[in-house]
């Protein structure tokens, strides 16, 4: 984050104005006009600076050749929708919600405040409280042991201290906005860069805080430890973490610097995981970016499953094909019905079909004679057909007539076939030209449909919307998808078809993506999975490493809170009351009370000439059990059991540098 320079135009102008007013001997009216001119100049400079800060994006290069836009992007918007279950549900969403749990932040602040306040109590303050109690209720040694007298006071002062500190912690926790930490985690998991804005800090009103305190001891401690309480109140009230709306984050390729803007105004940011540039392509290093390829594959499979479900919802799907059951007789019947007066082409086709049906010489001869009579009756030799007229002619004349008939028949057949072939060739060429023209038109129409007429079909959100639409509407949309009609030859058969409902199984893919998501989060943020004796998962919680990876940077780098001790992992399984009790039991107050008890016991023994045993029951006056484990110390045993059960490890917190570093 860039800080404003101390040598700003405002400082320089105001400094010169003061020097002129002190050194010059001008009249008051003239000095007043100079002041007005100077103020006008200052306002102009401030206006120019404000305009520059608000319109800084207008000075960016108009093209994207010199910057890499980190956010917004389609990939990150998809990540955000996945995390919050906008279109699909994943097991990783529950793990992400466990990571967003702001109760961990509250317990961290409660632990740090309680630890700092309780350990700041001095033995002199404990002794003063004891003296105040003795003055109000002196010990008279009448059927009351000093042990009972002191234990009542020790228990009372304990309840007062814990009650006041609990009120202070609740007052602080009320100023925590849960959404800020939630957005902090969302930015880390998706972009790796957390934008934030600092408002003008206002001095915290300790009077309202001290109203929660009833004892003078805690009152003095809070005043003495303002360096603990004040930064917490300032940090919680002066930092705002925005959501994903109107935020722009980009990287300058030349300077390799990252900048963040909200509504065209530069804001501060915290880089948790720096993006890389590999092969001139920006690559994020966040958990969601690592899962992105697998998530895309899984989404494609889910869309395929939904589409198959919708397409195969109808009860029956039938493939129809033309059946080759047209006989020669049917062909002849169709020809005769179409036109009674057949032309030469149809006669030729009829002749060829008759020949194919003829199985004897007589049938062939009848077919030939019928064809000749139909197309050219004049070429038939009447002498051959009318034997009574040609019986006296010579044999040579008959042979010559037969040869003439054969030649005419041959020529007629060849002529018909040539005409038919030529006509077919012309028609084929014409059809080719027409087919090419229509293919171009069909391609043009398809392109128009894809861009204009069928927007829903090519909507990028269509695949996701199918899950949320009603069944009837989803079916209407899916029916617009194109189908290809395939002709099947007689020599081929259908090997596979959707005669029955087919839906791809995604059970294995769902289980795999859940395992990948869980593994990525658990290993990136070192979360802890808590299981029972049967190995079944009970919960997912923060570990010591998770606190150092997420909570500590949030407090130090964003809220500028440096004096809080990290909460141990076993304390996360306790309530706020149990946390305070555990801190008190392990604090130095118990040792101070023991010291005061021994000291006062010795003094009272000298005053009343008492022995080390009680005068009535002969029991020892000094009983160390007053400070030994009691039922209230069960909380320490609980913490010990949790530590052993979870096998919790502790580590040293890293030292983050003070100040905002982006």
UniProtKB/Swiss-Prot annotation:
It holds the Pfam family Herpes_UL6. It is found in: Virion; Host nucleus. Residues 1-35 are annotated as: Disordered. Residues 1-26 have a biased composition (Polar residues). The keyword Protein transport does not apply. GO terms for cellular component: host cell nucleus; virion component. GO terms for biological process: chromosome organization. Its main location: virion. Keywords: Host nucleus, Viral genome packaging, Viral release from host cell, Virion. Forms a portal in the viral capsid through which viral DNA is translocated during DNA packaging. Assembles as a dodecamer at a single fivefold axe of the T=16 icosahedric capsid. Binds to the molecular motor that translocates the viral DNA, termed terminase. Belongs to the herpesviridae portal protein family. Homododecamerizes. Interacts with terminase subunits TRM1 and TRM3. This is Portal protein.
């Amino acid at each position: 984050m860039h800080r404003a320079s101390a040598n700003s135009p405002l400082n320089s102008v105001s400094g010169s104005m003061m020097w002129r007013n002190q050194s010059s001997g001008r009249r008051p009216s003239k000095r007043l006009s100079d002041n007005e001119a100077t103020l006008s100049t200052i306002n102009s400079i401030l206006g120019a600076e404000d305009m520059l800060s608000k319109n800084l994006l207008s000075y960016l290069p108009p093209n994207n050749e010199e910057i890499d836009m980190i956010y917004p992007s389609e990939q990150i918007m998809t990540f955000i929708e996945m995390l919050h279950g906008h279109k699909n549900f994943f097991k990783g969403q529950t793990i992400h919600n466990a990571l967003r749990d702001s109760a961990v932040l509250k317990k961290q602040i409660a632990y740090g405040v309680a630890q700092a306040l309780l350990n700041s109590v001095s033995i002199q303050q404990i002794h003063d409280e004891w003296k105040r109690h003795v003055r109000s209720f002196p010990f008279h040694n009448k059927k009351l042991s000093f042990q009972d007298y002191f234990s009542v006071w020790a228990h009372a002062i304990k309840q007062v201290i814990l009650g006041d500190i609990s009120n202070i912690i609740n007052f602080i926790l009320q100023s925590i906005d849960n959404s800020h930490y939630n957005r902090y985690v969302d930015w880390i998991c998706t972009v790796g860069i957390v934008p934030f804005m600092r408002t003008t800090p206002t001095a915290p009103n300790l009077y309202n805080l001290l109203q929660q305190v009833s004892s003078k001891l805690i009152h003095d401690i809070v005043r003495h430890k303002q360096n603990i309480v004040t930064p917490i109140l300032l940090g919680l009230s002066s930092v705002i973490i925005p959501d994903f709306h109107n935020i722009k984050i980009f990287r300058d390729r030349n300077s390799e610097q990252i900048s963040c803007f909200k509504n065209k105004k530069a804001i501060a940011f915290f880089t948790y995981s720096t993006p890389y540039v590999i092969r001139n392509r920006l690559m994020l290093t966040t958990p969601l970016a690592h899962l992105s390829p697998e998530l895309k594959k899984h989404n494609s499979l889910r869309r395929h499953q939904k589409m198959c479900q919708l397409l195969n919802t109808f009860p029956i799907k039938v493939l129809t094909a033309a059946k080759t059951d047209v006989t020669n007789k049917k062909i002849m019947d169709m020809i005769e019905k179409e036109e009674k007066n057949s032309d030469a082409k149809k006669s030729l086709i009829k002749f060829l079909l008759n020949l194919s049906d003829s199985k004897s010489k007589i049938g062939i001869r009848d077919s030939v004679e019928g064809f000749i009579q139909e197309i050219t009756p004049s070429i038939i030799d009447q002498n051959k057909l009318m034997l009574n007229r040609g019986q006296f002619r010579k044999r040579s004349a008959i042979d010559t007539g037969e040869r003439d008939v054969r030649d005419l028949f041959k020529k007629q057949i060849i002529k018909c076939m040539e005409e038919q072939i030529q006509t077919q060739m012309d028609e084929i060429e014409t059809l080719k030209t027409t087919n090419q023209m229509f293919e171009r038109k069909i391609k043009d129409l398809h392109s128009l449909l894809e861009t204009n007429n069928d927007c829903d079909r090519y909507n990028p959100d269509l695949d996701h919307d199918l899950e949320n639409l009603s069944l009837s509407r989803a079916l209407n949309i899916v029916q617009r998808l194109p189908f290809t009609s395939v002709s099947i030859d007689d020599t081929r058969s259908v090997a596979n078809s959707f005669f029955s409902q087919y839906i791809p199984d995604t059970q294995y893919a769902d289980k795999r993506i859940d395992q990948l998501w869980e593994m990525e989060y658990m290993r990136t943020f070192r979360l802890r999975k808590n299981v029972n004796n049967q190995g079944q998962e009970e919960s997912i919680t923060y570990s010591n490493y998770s606190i150092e990876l997420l909570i500590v940077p949030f407090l130090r780098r964003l809220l500028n809170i440096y004096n809080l001790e990290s909460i141990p992992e076993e304390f996360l399984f306790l309530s706020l009351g149990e946390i305070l009790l555990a801190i008190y039991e392990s604090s130095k107050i118990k040792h101070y009370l023991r010291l005061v008890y021994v000291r006062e016991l010795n003094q009272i023994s000298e005053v009343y000439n008492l022995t080390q045993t009680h005068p009535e029951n002969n029991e020892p006056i000094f009983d160390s059990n007053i400070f030994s484990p009691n039922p209230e110390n069960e909380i320490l045993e609980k913490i010990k059991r949790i530590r052993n059960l979870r096998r919790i490890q502790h580590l040293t917190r890293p030292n983050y540098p003070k100040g905002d570093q982006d």
